[in-house]
Amino acid sequence: MHVIRRMTRVVSTVAMVAGIATPMAVEAVRATPSAASVNAGSIAIGYENNGADPSIISVANKYFQREMGHDVRLKLFTSGPAALTSLASGQLPFMCGLGMPPVIAAIAQGVPLQVVFNQERYTKDAGLVVKTSSGIKSVAGLAGKSVGLVIGSQSSFELATYARKAGLNLSSVRLVNLTPPELQSAWATGRIEAAVVWDPVYDFLVTHGGRVLMDDSKLPVTATSFNICVANKSFASKHPAVARAFVKALGDGVSYLQNHRTAALGVMAKAAGISVATAKVEIAGYQIYSVSDQATAAVLGTSSATSATSGTAQSLLNNWRALYRAGTITTRTPKSAGPFVNPNYAK
């Protein structure tokens, strides 16, 4: 899941985010070519620092290199919208840690993406935080206030959902588009009075004069906040063994957390730049999905034929409807999100 988004046509084109598409860091690791990666060329994998979650274990422990071999390049992005240009260009065949709105924005512009791994559902690690000094007592109280978020990220959907339920017209709210690091700074300087954000910034705000007004546990499962991993459909269909190895590497991170929890907390804390205590709190705020969970009705569906009725596909549709109503995207909601969800690489 990331920090503030303006609700009016913030991601009407992928090109709008070109200015923030530069990755923060690139890690290149060469490994012996595996059967999966032969003829696939150099493989780029994008990811975000979402705090403590199993995918950061896969990055830190080099599971992608172990499973995929060959030349794997890891690119760190500040947010999902920041990765859109790379995804749209086809230069980034895999991306992890995305919220649904950036994926929807890309798909709406014709980028051939499929969700191939649903990492986790947010329950307590993302939401709406207000300053205790702001006087904001309810979602309706955001009227006339400055709210920070990452435009085009999951935060847009969350805020739109909270506002709709509270009867709040978002045109009455001053929305400030910031990256997660900028949001943290804006909070400290008093530029914003509230924010919709995810970990690790979410925890920072709560512990620095903030109060949780709403969290993602208030969202229904069919319209909830997930961290998801996507693959370029064209690339994955040409190199299915690579896609399966990508999913396997993500599963390795989940298994490490399940089997070596104490060590895993240390790995996640170091990789995310947080304390072990914070990592422990953050990981408790997720419902985490393993590889075996993927091909189930609640996650990606049992097959391509049933993916449209899966929890992930239904949440994609509900996110899409909310973003369309809010004017964040201009492409109408499709009848089915089944074509954008693929459980087969997890089998």
Kindly give the residue locations of the regions a language model identified.
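Short, glycine-/small- and polar/acidic-enriched structural segments
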Residues: 33-169, 174-177, 193
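Solvent-exposed, polar/charged alpha-helical surfaces in well-ordered, non-transmembrane soluble domains
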Residues: 62, 66, 85, 89, ...
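Short, surface-exposed acidic
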Residues: 170-173, 273-284, 329-337
